[in-house]
Amino acid sequence: MFQCLEPERNEETGPVYVRERGKLSVVGSHVSELRTRPCRLFSKGFSVELCGKQEDTSRHRQKPFIFTYTKEGSLRYSAKSLFTLTLDLITDNIHYVDSLMGFPDQIAEKLFTAAEAKHKFFTPCNGVMALRKFTEAYGDLVLSSLCLRGRYLLISERLEEIKSFQCLRSLDLSCCKLGDEHELLEHLSSDPMSSLTELYLKDNCFSDTGIRKMTASLRVLGKGLDALKVLDLSSNPGITDRGVLFLFGFKLLQFLDLSDTSIQDRSRTVKKIETKIGLVLSKKPIIQFEHRNCRTQGWAEQLLDQWENYIFSAIKPKDTLKSRKAAQQFYGKETKQNPLDSGICTLLTPVEQKQTHLQFFRPEEQKDSDSSKSDKRQRSTKRTGADPGQEDCTIAPATKRPRVTLTAADWDLLNSY
């Protein structure tokens, strides 16, 4: 039997085993009986691991207790409060929250600070969604004033996050080199930016086309930057006499800066601005355009600094900068200051060009009369307006978002758990 099967054996397939009368033997071998080891079900390095729910092991798991010291200096173990544990749970799952409307401002501020500490606003998709939930519910409490002067890297990297801020009253985009085709210029005329009262657009390479785009919704639909009071368009050589005509829609404007532009007929432009808007040419520099009081204010003030530090740490090699600075100090060379570090605004206008002072202001006598006229005009347009949805857009954010505040007794009750 073994001799018949011998020619059919292939070396590539390996030995062929035959069981006969309860004994195992190899086909073609002279050994009738072969001692074999028991066959393994799995390989030698195989292992089985029983695991439950997979958790993120990269982050440190917070324990539900804290250690404090007594007056005597001994270590005391105490559990976290229920409010703190609940706050941590909501912070870890902030992207699953549907809305924050109706939550008290004090709790929302603590929740925003906790989410900021855990870098919940850094991810591209979930970070923008979480930030919009805060801005939609609390508006100017998240950010009321935003200063992006010379921070064009932050604008390019965090554009969607910046566009999510609503109910801003002051916005400084000076020295950011945006241009007429930038996406942020179109966003300025949208409904979330209708609460702006101060807008600084100095040195942004704007022309008459950019001014036309920015004021299109105000001139055609009567919506957009209708509450604007301070406008800075200086150091934009592309703005000419034709671009000034698009500014006549700002009826509440009190301060206007058109210095260092390409306006040819100065006297005619001054007369048009005085008759259409009621602004008078100022002989002295106006304090509002010195950018002294413009700064970022709100809950997200430190968040913007974290974004900017993260961007700079990614583009700047720290070791080479330190070694270069040490070598320059050793050889006595003067170090050149980087505009990114100092925040200096470098203008595009050449130094040889003669600077023209062209700043306008509204006299004190006309401020009260113009404001009353504008209020009456807005009320009449609301009554004769077509859509009730447009009326809702013009309502103040404070009336649209009723806020709940906690008293001292409420805080004592929360801390007692």
From Swiss-Prot:
Pfam family, one: LRR_6
InterPro entries reported for this sequence: Leu-rich_rpt, LRR_dom_sf, LRRC42
Keywords for this protein: Leucine-rich repeat, Repeat
Annotated LRR repeat ranges: 167-188, 195-215, 227-249, 252-273
Region (Disordered): 360-399
Keyword Nucleotide-binding attached: no
Record field: compositional bias (Basic and acidic residues): 362-378
UniProt family annotation: Belongs to the LRRC42 family.
Name the UniProt record assigns to this protein: Leucine-rich repeat-containing protein 42
Upper taxonomic lineage: Eukaryota, Metazoa, Chordata, Craniata, Vertebrata
